[in-house]
C-alpha cells in the first residue's frame, strides 16, 4: 500500500486497520505508517516492531503506538489472549481456543468480525467476540471454511 493510498484512507470518517507483517514485508508495513486510525488490530510482534520496543510491558507499547493516533487498539497475543486499549483504559481477555489446529487466519477472523463493531462497541465486546472468532478459526485447517455467524453465536453461548 502506497503512502498516497494511506493518506487517502486516513481521510475516511472511520478507519479500521490491520497492518500485518510477514516474511516479505517485515519492517515495511508498520501501523506507524498510518497517521491516524480509529481502530487498530495487530499482533504482539507487530506492535513491538512498530514501537521499536522489545522489552517493555505490552501496555506501554500500546500506549506509545496509540498516542495521538488511535483511540481503540487491540493487540492479539495467540494462546495468551488479547489486550485492548480504549482511550487510556486497558483490558486483557484470555484466549478461549480449546484445540488449535492451525493459527493461520486467526487475526484476520478477529479483525473481520470486530472492525464493523468498533465504532459503537465496547473494548470488552470487541475482545470477547474477536477472541471467539479467533478460537473458532484456529480449529479449521488452512482456509477450508470460514467462521460462520451460527458457529460464532453457538461458541459464545457455550463459553
Task: State each model region's role.
Residues 1-103, 118-123, 127-132, 139-159:
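Ribokinase/PfkB-type carbohydrate-kinase core domain
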Residues 107:
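Short basic (Lys/Arg) and small-residue
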Residues 113-114:
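Flexible, glycine-rich loop/tail regions that form catalytic "lids" or insertion modules at the edges
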